[in-house]
Amino acid sequence: TINLNRCIQYAVKNGMHYLTYLEEIVDLVHKVQTAYNENLKDLQAKGMLPLFDAGYINLARQYLTIGVNGLVEAAEFLGIPINDNDDYVDFVQGVLGLIERYNKKYRSKELMFNCEMIPAENVGVKHAKWDREDGYVVPRDCYNSYFYVVEDESLNVIDKFRLHGRRYIAHLTG
């Protein structure tokens, strides 16, 4: 899972454009996932994956997931209002579109990738805790897995639906 808030804050603090730095991270994550897939092949060849051998899981049809967390918090750090506006759409599409481009770049007959917003119950708490300990700006104790700030009472149900509409989720594939 890519901690977008940490990555984007790191880039800004080090004088880089956040998409340039994020591209390095996304490329690295794809290389790690590719190596993980090779490890699974080796384990299966040694008979160590009985569910795969029994046909319950087909390695050739298994997606390698690029998870993301901290998207809203990263946008907040950049001063982008978290509501249905063009700046926020551009930010979300830029970040998630980058991941989708790399998913397509690394796709092969043997490899398929998808991108998912990772549920925040576990990793969102850990990311926020670790980032706070390391001096990053952390606006809440749990990075959420929505496209809006959960505690924002100014958003109504229609706003929340808009923030999960096509313009925002177009590059999520998981």
Predicted regions and their residues:
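Structured mid-domain segments that build the active-site/substrate or prosthetic-cofactor binding neighborhood
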Residues: T1-N69, E73-E76
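Short intrinsically disordered, low-complexity coil segments enriched in acidic
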Residues: T1-R6, V68, C115, Y168-G174
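Flexible loop/turn segments at secondary-structure boundaries
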Residues: I8-V12, I80-P81, E121-K126
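Flexible helix-coil linker/hinge segments at domain or subdomain boundaries
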Residues: V32-K41, E100-E110
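A glycine-rich phosphate-binding loop feature that marks nucleotide/adenosyl-phosphate handling sites
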Residues: D42-Y56, L96, K109-K129
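Modules that initiate DNA replication and primer synthesis
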Residues: G55-Q62, E73-E76, I80-I82, E100-R101, ...
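Short secondary-structure subsegments characteristic of cysteine-rich extracellular domains
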Residues: D84-N103
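Catalytic alpha/beta core of large soluble enzyme barrels
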Residues: N122-V125, R132-G174
